[in-house]
Design a protein with these regions (language model features):
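Core nucleotide-handling region used for phosphoryl-transfer chemistry
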Residues: 1-206
Length: 206
């Protein structure tokens, strides 16, 4: 006989509903910057590159990224070992962003850790936790944070998001690709623009 409980405890329903954070989905390219064994790395699409490999691979990394990394190296070196900064590299998509509103090239949307197999773990989307990958406990000036569109106290349906999207577009007075809905560090995307063209949101198996 083995004396052990294998079924996990069920979490209690909270008396007070958690806040649902709705952030703007930027039209950018996914980029992760992390440090492993004191060496900075970048991860884009299906490639992971050490900082000392970048010069020989300038032709395969995002446009403008190599020089940006060189210009901001001192600030990026404050990333802790095994910590990951996840975000959007903007400027290559169909939607164009005004420098007055978006004065950065890289906008953080998550923090994480990386294991020895170069897999992400402990991914967190709460903006209050975004300082922790950095030794200074400050987000470097070269890194922005994705805009928060709404903080609401209910899980929005598609119809709710349609209304929120229309209001947000009117508020910012520009095209918006969509939203990311974050509830308890579980995210789902609501997409309204594809290749720069407005469309209705629909479910699709990725």
């Amino acid at each position: 006989m083995i004396k052990k409980s294998i079924y996990p405890k069920t979490t209690r329903v909270k008396c007070k509903f958690d806040v649902v954070e709705v952030t703007e989905k930027l039209d950018g390219s996914n980029l992760c910057i992390f440090k492993k064994d004191d060496m900075l790395h970048i991860a884009q699409r299906n490639k992971i590159l050490r900082f000392d490999e970048l010069e020989d691979n300038k032709n395969v990394i995002y446009k403008g990224l190599y020089q940006w990394l060189l210009d901001n190296l001192d600030m990026l070196q404050t990333i802790r070992n095994d910590s990951v900064v996840c975000g959007e590299w903007i400027g290559m998509g169909k939607l164009k962003y005004s420098v007055d509103e978006f004065d950065k090239r890289f906008y953080m949307f998550a923090k994480a850790n990386i294991n020895d197999d170069f897999e992400l773990c402990n991914i967190q989307y709460n903006h209050e936790h975004f300082i922790y990958p950095f030794e200074t406990l400050e987000i470097p000036k070269c890194i922005g944070v994705v805009p928060v569109a709404y903080r609401i106290s209910y899980l929005p349906s598609k119809d709710n998001l349609d209304v929120l999207y229309a209001r947000y577009c009117e508020k910012v007075n520009r095209n918006v690709e969509g939203f990311i809905v974050n509830y308890r560090d579980h995210i789902e995307k609501y997409v309204r623009m594809k290749n720069g063209t407005l469309q209705d949101h629909f479910d699709r198996v990725e």
